[in-house]
Amino acid sequence: MPEPAKFAPAPKKGSKKAVTKAQKKDGKKRKRSRKESYSIYVYKVLKRVHPDTGIWCKAMGIMNSFLNDIFERIAGEASRLAHYNKRSTITSRRSRRPCACCCPASWPSTPCPRAPRRSPSTPAPSESLPGPGARSLPPSLPPRVAGCFVSKGSFQGHLTPLVK
């Protein structure tokens, strides 16, 4: 008498487990590997800013790769600055400078809602602004050629080079 063929039981109607699991040839179930992405966060921000607007899958992929690239740049610059200053940890205060270095020149001039604001009478910390011998750049050079820039003062948009 022939043996009955071993098949996986058919998924019940409305069951979502069949969608999330892939089948091997020997009948054992295997979970798909999870991919991390920023798509849910991009979607939440989009709905908060423009509630009636949607986003295509390809556009979400572009936004995801953009955010990965920005975070890689910021992390690389932060670790480089921590190494230069002989620090083993990166604090939240020290993370603003790499953001200013990696982002376009207009981004650091936009204040963050949670960023601590410094009054004009308070002296600037020595590590965030260049010394008195800092040279200004000629206006013909693009900002990326000369190096990083930071906002001067309390987010007034006046940019000065970090290079001495």
UniProtKB/Swiss-Prot annotation:
**UniProt KW DNA-binding keyword:** yes
Describe how it is modified after translation: Phosphorylation at Ser-37 (H2BS36ph) by AMPK in response to stress promotes transcription. Phosphorylated on Ser-15 (H2BS14ph) by STK4/MST1 during apoptosis; which facilitates apoptotic chromatin condensation. Also phosphorylated on Ser-15 in response to DNA double strand breaks (DSBs), and in correlation with somatic hypermutation and immunoglobulin class-switch recombination.
Residues the record lists as N6-butyryllysine modifications: 6, 21
Q: Where is this region: Disordered?
A: 1-33, 111-140
Q: Where is this cross-link: Glycyl lysine isopeptide (Lys-Gly) (interchain with G-Cter in ubiquitin)?
A: 35
| Residue(s) carrying N6-succinyllysine | 35
| Keywords linked to the UniProt accession | Acetylation, Chromosome, DNA-binding, Hydroxylation, Isopeptide bond, Methylation, Nucleosome core, Nucleus, Phosphoprotein, Ubl conjugation
Q: Which residues carry this modification: N6-lactoyllysine?
A: 6, 12, 16-17, 21, 24, 44, 86
Identify residues that carry N-acetylproline: 2
- The protein in question is named Putative histone H2B type 2-D
Q: Where in the cell is it found?
A: Nucleus; Chromosome
Q: What does this protein do?
A: Core component of nucleosome. Nucleosomes wrap and compact DNA into chromatin, limiting DNA accessibility to the cellular machineries which require DNA as a template. Histones thereby play a central role in transcription regulation, DNA repair, DNA replication and chromosomal stability. DNA accessibility is regulated via a complex set of post-translational modifications of histones, also called histone code, and nucleosome remodeling.
Which residues are recorded with the post-translational modification Phosphoserine? 15, 37
Where are the membrane-spanning stretches? none
What quaternary structure, including any partners, is listed in this protein's UniProt entry? Answer: The nucleosome is a histone octamer containing two molecules each of H2A, H2B, H3 and H4 assembled in one H3-H4 heterotetramer and two H2A-H2B heterodimers. The octamer wraps approximately 147 bp of DNA.
- N6-crotonyllysine-modified residues are where? 6, 12-13, 16-17, 21, 24, 35
Q: Identify the stretch annotated as signal peptide in this record.
A: none
Q: Does the keyword Ubl conjugation apply?
A: yes
